[in-house]
Amino acid sequence: MAALTDADCLVVKIGSALLVDRDAGGLRQAWLASLAQDVAWLTRQGVKVVLVSSGSIALGRGILKLSDTDLPLEQAQAAAAVGQIRLARAYEEVLAPHGITTGQVLMTLDDSSNRRRYLNSRATLKQLLSMGVVPIVNENDTIATDEIRFGDNDRLAAQIAVTVGADQLVLLSDVDGFYSANPNIDPTAQRFDEIGEITPEIEDMAGDACSGLSKGGMKTKLMAAKIATAAGCRMAITEGVVLNPLRALNEGAAATWFRADTDPQAARKGWIAAMKPKGTVHLDSGALAALRSGKSLLPAGVSHITGHFQRGDPVAIADGAGHTVGHGLVRYTAEEAGRIMGRKSNEIESVLGYPARAALIHRDDMALTIQNGD
């Protein structure tokens, strides 16, 4: 078991069935207040926390007095629009007394599959966390359609964990872990304390969702575990219905942990290094020295650009002799990079005509093959 207090960044997924009283259609206020206590406790330990919360459609359904059956797309989107305001306010009200500022972030599948938007969402989330803000993330159900939606917040939570480089992900569920069979119908079902590899046999054990409010079942949780662990993030499934569920997990409550065999930073750098570059950014000796010391690549250190690339595309990074020294995800198009190369960061806006980021390639989006002293 991993201690939550050991995490640098923790992502917590909260399902509709935990947050919303199915019969009354309102929030489970006492439970939400206890969750806020847990978040405050973790932030005091120096842990950065991101909450991925369902509940907007379930809340809006109750406010609009819609049926509790599957809703047509238009009604679901209307319910999300109404419920999202209530959901954001609820988190603000329970966390503010602990001195915690919240920020709302709405995502769609496009925001992770499109590299440019992925980099933008990553930068925003990282900035919020650096300022001590607890982001409240939800799928943007008001505009998402079947073609551009995650479909469940288990996978969204895993993608957010990858995006922010979290080292732990907790899925608060209506069961206390992953079982060999459905424990509600099979008395011989056994819970796994830890799973090191998601094999075909493990996948065959997963069932489907049975809750009237939640869309996520064990199959989606396994998908989330694959996404998270491949990026170096450990993941836990634990029962969330109890009060103070995060503190309970930290103190040894029943759960299933999915092991990650690498750390988030190493996994991300391996992912970047494996991409086929769309172009090359050539550096001067000063920029090369800066990269060796762990700095981001600024336009001032670029001598010339080759290839055709868009924002978010992978590029090779080369020294003055043309030798590849790394790879990175670039924050500018080839045309923009050509205009600002050799320029100081405070000149970028005047050259491009609009505000822009200081780094051409941020150090978090870079995988180098050189080391200090090379």
From Swiss-Prot:
Superkingdom assignment:
Bacteria
- The reply on keyword Ion transport is no
Protein localization: Cytoplasm
- Protein name per its UniProtKB record: Glutamate 5-kinase
- What organism, scientifically named, is this protein from? Roseobacter denitrificans (strain ATCC 33942 / OCh 114)
* Every PUA domain range: 278-355
Supply the CDD domains for this chain. AAK_G5K_ProB, PUA_G5K
**Catalytic activity, EC:** 2.7.2.11
The Gene Ontology terms for molecular function here are: ATP binding; glutamate 5-kinase activity; RNA binding
A GO CC term attached to the entry: cytosol
Q: Name one Pfam family in it.
A: PUA
Species lineage, top-down?
Answer: Bacteria, Pseudomonadati, Pseudomonadota, Alphaproteobacteria, Rhodobacterales
Q: In which pathway does it act?
A: Amino-acid biosynthesis; L-proline biosynthesis; L-glutamate 5-semialdehyde from L-glutamate: step 1/2
> What UniProt keywords apply to this chain's record, in alphabetical order?
Amino-acid biosynthesis, ATP-binding, Cytoplasm, Kinase, Nucleotide-binding, Proline biosynthesis, Transferase
- The gene designation is proB
PROSITE patterns (UniProt xref):
GLUTAMATE_5_KINASE, PUA
> What does the protein in this record do?
Catalyzes the transfer of a phosphate group to glutamate to form L-glutamate 5-phosphate.
Cross-referenced InterPro entries, in alphabetical order? AceGlu_kinase-like_sf, Asp/Glu/Uridylate_kinase, G5K_ProB, Glu/AcGlu_kinase, Glu_5kinase, Glu_5kinase/COase_Synthase, Glutamate_5-kinase_CS, PUA
Q: What class of enzyme is it?
A: transferase
| Catalytic activity of the protein | L-glutamate + ATP = L-glutamyl 5-phosphate + ADP
Which sites bind ATP? 13, 173-174
